[in-house]
Amino acid sequence: MAKDIEAAAAHEGKDYSDPPPAPLVDAEELTKWSLYRAVIAEFVATLLFLYITVATVIGYKHQTDAAASGPDAACGGVGVLGIAWAFGGMIFILVYCTAGVSGGHINPAVTFGLFLARKVSLVRALLYIVAQCLGAICGVGLVKGFQSAFYVRYGGGANELSAGYSKGTGLAAEIIGTFVLVYTVFSATDPKRNARDSHVPVLAPLPIGFAVFMVHLATIPITGTGINPARSLGAAVIYNNDKAWDDHWIFWVGPFIGAAIAAAYHQYVLRASAAKLGSSASFSR
């Protein structure tokens, strides 16, 4: 009986395993079609994400414009809640669709955090970020092409620091918001959780999308919610207004800092990777 209990305990302790750290530079990866397929998936997913979300923002502003003519003028629009749902819902859908191909990053900050945690190589991270930025630019470009009459009039969906808030407040909002997102990504994709909940594959995209939704509710009044440098860059490039570029650095620095903190917190506090490394070093002496 005791042996059965020990065997069961040993089996439970080995029901999952952490994948080995990704190499910093993997030249062989460049010869694999799977890498380029993943890059294409990131490009298309980010394009769709920006198209739907920015179109929602423009549509809402048009519907609530008192000077607008026609039946839309009397419509209350989707509101901030609807905009937040558009962003969170699209992330849920796109992560679910692309997770098996590229991991479903759709955000340079997420890619950066996973790179710091050695989940992806430097080569893959750089290609992902380039694809995400290009996809975002193309996605916002489609919005401008389809809604040219309203695009410039309603701000192009660009992130801007709202009046009454300091640069420090905007930066802090982006850091905290991105921390929430990337921390959720790490937790939802943790190998131990995957082993236990593998029969419910929707569980990972759901909290990630919901995190995006909640962060938008909190930070739309402050920065319009960036937490995704590609999203901010795409809107700024297509809108190309001085105000959109004035504080654009906030939407890169903030998310990257937030992602780095989330990666460190998950890897070296929650998963105690630092302790594991220390133990390995002591045994090797």
UniProtKB/Swiss-Prot annotation:
It is a multi-pass membrane protein. A motif (NPA 1) lies at residues 107-109. One of its GO terms (cellular component) is protein-containing complex. A motif (NPA 2) lies at residues 228-230. Specifically expressed in roots, in the exodermis, endodermis and xylem parenchyma. Polar localization to the external periclinal side of epidermal cells in root apices. Homomers. May interact with PIP1-2 to form heteromers. Belongs to the MIP/aquaporin (TC 1.A.8) family. PIP (TC 1.A.8.11) subfamily. This is Aquaporin PIP2-5. It comes from Zea mays (Maize). The lineage of its organism: Eukaryota, Viridiplantae, Streptophyta, Embryophyta, Tracheophyta. The gene is PIP2-5.
